[in-house]
Every structure is written in C-alpha cells, then in structure tokens.
Amino acid sequence: MAFTIEVEEWVGSVWHRFITRRASPDFPEARVDLESMQRSLSLMFRAMGGASGVGVEAASARDLVLRRNLLQQVAGTCMQLPVAWCDSSNLRLPQSLAVYPEVSLNQDLYRWLALIAAQAGQMRHWARDNQRWTQALLEQFPAMRPRYQRLVEAHLQLRPDPKQLPKAEAALEAALCQALREPGSVSQFPRCERAPWPLSLWLYPAENLGEPQAVYRVEEGEGDLETPPSGQSRQRNGARRVDDSSSKGGLLLFRLENLFSWSEHVELDRCDDDTEDLDAARVRGPRRTGSVAPRMRQGGGLKLDLDLPASDFDDVPLGEGIKLPEWNYRKQCLQKDFVNLQMMLPCGSEPKPLPLRLSPLARRLRRQFEHLRNDRQWLRQQPQGSELDMQAWLDFHVERQNGQCAERGLFMEQRQNRRDLACLLLADLSMSTDAHLDNEHRVIDVVIDSLLLFGERLSAVGDPFALYGFSSLRRQQVRMQELKSFRQPYGDETRGRIQALKPGYYTRMGAAIRQATELLGNCKQRRKLLLLVTDGKPNDLDLYEGRYGVEDTRQAVMEARRQGLLPFCITIDREAGDYLPYMFGANGYTLIKEPQQSAFPPAAAVQATDPA
C-alpha cells in the first residue's frame, strides 16, 4: 500500500510539473532576476527624478480576474500574477521577468518600468495616467522611442487575440492595444467584467488598504507617549477589508447561561484564559490573503509590557527621560517631543581589563597612534627656522653641483601639533546583533571588540572621546547606554561596561543620532566626529520602518552636519549600498566584510585620527 501511495505521489508530481510548464505564459530560458539589476535600477530611478528615499523591492503576486485558457484552468495557474506598482515608500517590480523570449527585452522592460515610475505621480485613472506618463517620457527622451516600440510590438504578439474574446473584452483589448501603440490617443475605455491580460509596460495601482479602523492607534504626533497593544504582526501579507457580520443574525441553539453553570463544576484553572496570546500571529502562519475586519475597542484591563525585563535585571536608568523630535516625511515636518530617550548604564557591569585575545592588537595600535599626540614636532625644509636642515642642505648642494639650483627651504622649525578633535562612537545594540556572522563570531562580539579597540586607539592619541550604545522599543522607549562620557577617563570601568553589553531591541537610529549630536556639540574642539556602528536599516515596532525610518535618520544626519559635526557610518550589512549613500552620502560610510576587520576599517581610522 505504501508503494502504491508513493507511485501516486510521483505520478501526481510529474503531472503537476508537466501541466504547469505547458500552461505557463513565461519563457524560463530568458528569465531575468530583479536582484541582478536592483542596484542599477535604483540609480536609474533616482537619476531620472524619482524620490531618493524610495527603494526598489520585489512585488508579490496579485489576484486578477482574468480569462484563462483551458490549460491554465486545468493547471490552476495565472490566478495570481506579479505586476509593477509604486507608492511613496517603494517601487515594487516583479521578482523576475520572463515575459519576452529574449533576455535583452526582459532587461529593457525592467529599465522601462523604472523610468516610467520616475515620471509617475498620483494615479487617478489607470489607463489614462499610464498613457500620460508614457507620452511625457517619450517626449522628454525621444531616443527611447525605438526601444519602447520594440517592447510594445513584442508584447502585442503575446496578448490574446481580440477575435477569440467576447464582445466587451474584445473592445477593451483593442482599446488597450491602441493605447500602447499611440500613448494618449485613447481617453475612453469600454467596461468589462474581467480584467485584461496584464500590461507589463504599465504601472498598476498601489496595494493600499486605507487607514485601519483601529480605535487604539495613536495619531502621529498627537497624544501622550503610550504603549500600543502588542501582537501586531510586521509580516507583509496580502489582505482585503471585509465587514464583520458575526454580530448579525444567526440562530441560538443553546442557552448561554448553561455554559457558566457547567464550568463551575469543572476543576480547571482559568486564570490565564483572558491573557493575550503573544504567539497567535506566529501560530496562524503566513497566508496569501487574509481578511482584515474593523477592530472594536476592548474593555479596559491591566496591561503588562512583557517585552521589557524586570527592573532587577534591566539596565540602570540615569535621570529622567529626554524628549526628542522626529521627522515625518509624509507631513514634511519635525514632530516635537515625539520620542522619549532614556540614558542607562549596562546592568551587571564590573571593572574588567582588556581581554587577552585583544592585547597584542591593542599594543600594536597604541604604538602606531602614540606619535599623533599633541607633541612638538620638527618641520623640515622651512624657509627660516632655529636649526639647519642638513638633509635639505645636502640635497641642495648635490643639485647645484649637477647644474640645478632649485629654491628650497634649508631650515628646521619646531611647532606644536594640535589635533583639536573630539569623537563620539555610537553602537547599534539591536536584537539583530545576536545573529552569527560565521561559526565563531556574533555581531555583538564584533561590536564589543570594535568599541574596545577604538577606545585603546583614542586613549593612546589623547583625543577626548565618548562611547555609547543604543536600542529602542517603539518611540516611548529609546534606550541609550552610557559606556564612557567625555568627562570620564578610559579604564577598566569602561572596559567592563563594554564587555557587559547585550543585544537589545530595535533600531530607532534618528533619536540616537540627535542625542549624540547634542552631546558632541557641547565639546569645544574644532573638529567633531560622530561614528555610528550598525548592522542594518533603522526600524522599530511602530511606524519606524522602511522609508519613514530612513528619512528620519537622514534628517538627523543633516542636522548634525549643520551643527558642524562629521557623521560617518560603519556597517556590516552587505546591502548597505542601497540606503546608506542616501542617509550618509556616498563617502559617509564604509563596509566591514570580514569579522577580522573589527579593529576599524582604514577609512574611519584615518578620518578619526587625521590631524586637523
């Protein structure tokens, strides 16, 4: 019997692969992946006028009511197809394109979608707006017209034959084909119950669900710093809004009071029945499409935030919280007192020496950087000075004997070398730092080693510096660990605090940068360097993700530059090139590719220790 079942499963899998391949409208041999062109498409999108904070991401398949042929109906395919769309946060393109039988055409289609998205605005009518954007793009760049015509002609050959469609669908198909050939020539489109076959050269409306009708959502910038209910999933699944009709109608087949009477005789402990199931979202698992019903306000009760540890095991707070602003790119305004930042000391920290494994490297670094102290140095080849520069005089004598007599300084002068530099290092301590880089190193281990070696370097140079770490749990709880302030000396107490660091929560980067800017701005040194060590994008549990977090961080970096600071980012995220140039500038960051580079990359070290 088991053998029969295996044969049936094998035959079923073979049939499934066969029928899906035959029913697929794609050309697998000419498939082009978005990942291979994502960087170039991002550059093209921004160069053509697209918003700098908009990223290029993969689009999920969308439900479309299409007319499918017999093979597609038997295979159960083409019910969901990926289409391109754009909103204020992302340009969503299909994860791969195999629309055309040639690789070059699929690549040109990706480029065309990026170009038309840069021209696109708010969509009011799908067909008329796409015609208008296409017409404007071709008028602005006439050299694109031959390439566009090739894409259109190849696309029209793959579309359904209007002669084989019902009258209403045939009329709509003819109008769409005319709109593709001559953009702007069609203003009225026939109504049809079925959607036309996807037009791969056009953008589709964004998948917006509208504002959720949750009564406990706090309006941005208003209200107190309250903690919203937990359990809100960050997973991006397909969704549709439906009316909650569970309270209407229905036949009552039992008496509800009987349930209470029977439960009184059952020996069950129901003290935990009313608590919130924190794993409910995980247990339900991902779905292609979910139903989002309006949520009703629940009754009041005692709400405990189990995300934070007990006070006996938590970091030690330093004073009251600090209210900080936050940039809202949607409203284009700085929301005052929107974030609460709490300065803290690492819990359980004790004075500790430098780990033995780092001692040889630390000694070598101290020897390399001790010569940069504010000591008096001899300047050679000066036009005047207190002593004769014998090497310069010897070179001058040899050149004169050979017939050359170039003017040069023949004296040496001793001057004070003043660096006049203050530096603050800000380390990202989010929960993602608990991940492993390889079999031996975690991200938090690399961060700790970087902090220790950075402290050894600057203590050898003698520059004033400070060390801080940060993580966050929504805007009400931005936690900033003080490892070493500018007033404190660097010693075993600071080393112990660094070695006691643990992964925290999330990464509200803008608030941490603003507080670091305030601390560093109070220094009297002429040059002020703000170093940020991180492992990924800014994000938090609330609205602080995607473009919102990137825009707020960029605004915080710009505020720091306006105050005369030099922000510089050090990251281990291999995808940092997609967003860090926008936040810190093309030369404002560097990438650590190997854990052995935790002793700080050369670019950051040169910028941190270069004499003023």
Swiss-Prot record:
PROSITE patterns: VWFA. It comes from the Bacteria. Residues 220-246 are annotated as: Disordered. It holds the Pfam family VWA. Residues 420-609 form the VWFA domain. Disulfide bonds: none annotated. Component of the anaerobic respiratory chain that transforms nitrate to dinitrogen (denitrification). This is Protein NorD. It comes from Stutzerimonas stutzeri. The lineage of its organism: Bacteria, Pseudomonadati, Pseudomonadota, Gammaproteobacteria, Pseudomonadales.
